[in-house]
Amino acid sequence: MSAAPEQDTGHPHHIDIQDDRVSPREDDEDASHGMKNSKGWDGKLRISKSALLSNPEALSDPEYSDDDNVLPGDEIRADEDLLESESSDSEEIMCTHSRVRSIASLRLDRFKHVARICLRQNNIQEIEGIAPLAATLKDLDLYDNLISHMRGMDDLKNLTSLDLSFNKIKHIKNIGHMTELKELFLVANKISKIEGLENFGKLTSLELGSNRIRELRNLENLKSLEELWVAKNKITELTGLGGLPNLRLLSIQSNRIRDLSPLKEIPGLEELYISHNALESLEGIEQNTRLKILDISNNQVSNLRGLEGLAKLEELWASYNQIGDFTEVEKVLKDKEDLTTVYFEGNPLQLRGPALYRNKVRLALPQLKQIDASMFSHLTLP
């Protein structure tokens, strides 16, 4: 399913992904100038690192419409079989970037054992022709198509993963019967309201980044949810999270959050990505003592008060804030034995003396292995 990027024909493309087997990860386009955590992740949304995005406005503008940016090409001819080489016993069908307009034209009913279907980056407008596979189908991936409505999936009761990201969907509907779902990806659509999730007690990951959502609501039945990705929306408050006892990761970059105090409702949180918001203080985060990774970059935070009790903290991304006191940094962070990575670039404490900045941080926090983009196998102080 690998495909080399097409030559530029003068027409705008969607996304060219060289390896569609890499699950795209939610993008927060501004994940702060090269910052990466210990696993090499830079805080961006679910887009493969090999993706070539030639219409970036699709991510930055929630009002963006790609009606005029469809790949040129003719509909599949009646006698053309794109799946001719596939065995009838195949458990995985992949047909990506092939200008498919109709799922029915693929005649999927001949494959009796299919567990996964991936039809990414096509021109599909309607979900159809999949019902005959309902008994075996577990994973349906229709990422980057032209789908406006969540219809045609009434028989798909055994799905555990559904990806309808980068489509034109406005409402989450007609999937309440998918009670086995564990992963639901609806990134970069036109969704303004979280709804229709009442029956998803087994859901562990929900991705709704790059939509038009203003409020976190209707999540209380998601008792198994571990990861919630809602970056690049219009959310102003962290309310509505109290019914998520297993939430481990919250990605809410590029919203309008000012107050962290509602986080006390999710004390089990281990990773919080809240860059590019309107934070001026970290007060309210004190009860999240299980936090291991905290990204507060690109806010207006002037001090680290609130982090004193976060003994398990491993990574702190705090670039481009208003932090200026080395003494306070040492006081708050020096006792955190697991802390290995910090980012403070773009703060007054770095801008005032960039030549001495890293050495000062190393002296204050000798347990570190990484300061900004610089990694150390062993810190040898001058």
Each predicted region: which residue ranges?
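Conserved ABC ATPase nucleotide-binding domain signature region
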Residues: 150, 172, 194, 216, ...
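Conserved strand-to-helix beginnings and helix N-cap segments that scaffold or border functional pockets
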Residues: 130, 153, 175, 197, ...
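The feature captures the LRR N-terminal capping module
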Residues: 1-148, 157-170, 179-192, 200-214, ...
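Metal-dependent phosphoesterase signature
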Residues: 244, 266, 288
